[in-house]
Amino acid sequence: GSDGAERTSVAHATLDAQGKARYQFDLSYSVPRIDPTVVDHLHTGSIAVTVEPGGSQVVSTVRQIRQRATISYDPNARPTIMGSPAAVLSRIEEVIGLCDLVKASDEDLAWLYPDATVEEVLRYWTGLGPTLVVCTRGPAGATALLRDNRELLQVGPIDVPVADTVGAGDSFMAGMVSGLLSVGLLGGLEARQRLRSADWSAVQPALHRAI
């Protein structure tokens, strides 16, 4: 450790018999100053957006950075920290409206919108602003929607033994973001325009990479 370093947030994960995790959090964070001229893509998510005082700082940073960079977001609901859906939904939807890419799990959607289907939520979210929205569905794979292509894309799963699900959503997001970056569909304002005009043939390889 370092005597001079700031405290960082810690998540303690406890696994059940199926490998699903329950978390306890020890939170402490602030957003460092970022030079927007050196950023082409910014990703954020979960409690970083919804928990204060850092949450407001994150939203302010997203608003600044998106003037020249693409933005991705994973709401990654944590009810034990976030409280009720009503307490965080307006902030989550605010950030969704600033994004190019949004990914959430079916569990996230069920918590945030208990009376809506996955398709209804994805269509609602594209109306807020993002070009590509994706819902991961565990053993059922993923469902995706492009804002200007009203046909849902179903991406099948890969059958593998599951030891635990810790980091599964983050791994999916990392694969998808890196896949879109590698083909120029994320990473700066020109990439934003390319993503907006992309069809499924351009986007699908990144989704398979994420799976």
Per-segment meaning from a language model:
Residues 24-26, 43, 72, 103, ...:
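Conserved beta-strand segments that form the floor/walls of ligand-binding pockets within enzyme
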Residues 24-30, 81-87, 115, 195-196:
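Short gly/ser/thr-rich secondary-structure transition/capping motifs
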